[in-house]
């Protein structure tokens, strides 16, 4: 007896007008995640996942490419306005914001959410090379 064909429903993408771009810029890599206002991730990209390995991963150009790839991933949601939250001291902070602006998003505000300790944990000892 023949199996009945399995019907798959086409996933309908919800339309989101405003989004939040979370940029985590470390010294070694840059991670860009675009979420809706509630924090549900819509798309993400990293400099390492964009084809950059080793020391090239920690360049501003790699962060720019990661931001462009993330922007392409969330275009189908219809996002027009972005709020950017930048975390970390890495070299990809500025270039990520420029790339998101060039991708056609209107950036409403930029917030620095880098965690700063109020004299918390003891930092690691200094390197002696």
From Swiss-Prot:
One of its GO terms (cellular component) is ribosome. The keyword Ribosomal protein applies. Disulfide bonds: none annotated. The keyword rRNA-binding applies. PROSITE patterns: RIBOSOMAL_S11. Keywords: Ribonucleoprotein, Ribosomal protein, RNA-binding, rRNA-binding. InterPro entries: Ribosomal_uS11, Ribosomal_uS11_bac-type, Ribosomal_uS11_CS, Ribosomal_uS11_sf. GO terms for biological process: translation. One of its GO terms (molecular function) is rRNA binding. It comes from the Bacteria. Part of the 30S ribosomal subunit. Interacts with proteins S7 and S18. Binds to IF-3. NCBIfam families: PRK05309.1, uS11_bact. Located on the platform of the 30S subunit, it bridges several disparate RNA helices of the 16S rRNA. Forms part of the Shine-Dalgarno cleft in the 70S ribosome. Belongs to the universal ribosomal protein uS11 family. This is Small ribosomal subunit protein uS11. It comes from Serratia proteamaculans (strain 568). The gene is rpsK.
């Amino acid at each position: 007896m023949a199996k009945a064909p399995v019907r798959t429903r086409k996933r309908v993408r919800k339309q989101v007008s405003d989004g939040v771009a979370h940029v985590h810029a470390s010294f070694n890599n840059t991670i860009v995640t675009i979420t809706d206002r509630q924090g549900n991730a819509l798309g993400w990209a990293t400099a390492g996942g964009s084809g950059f390995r080793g020391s090239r991963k920690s360049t501003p150009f790699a962060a720019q490419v990661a931001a462009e790839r993330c922007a392409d991933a969330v275009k189908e949601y219809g996002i027009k306005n972005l709020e950017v939250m930048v975390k970390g001291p890495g070299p990809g902070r500025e270039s990520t914001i420029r790339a998101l602006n060039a991708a056609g998003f209107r950036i409403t505000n930029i917030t620095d959410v880098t965690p700063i300790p109020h004299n918390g944990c003891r930092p690691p000892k200094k390197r002696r090379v």
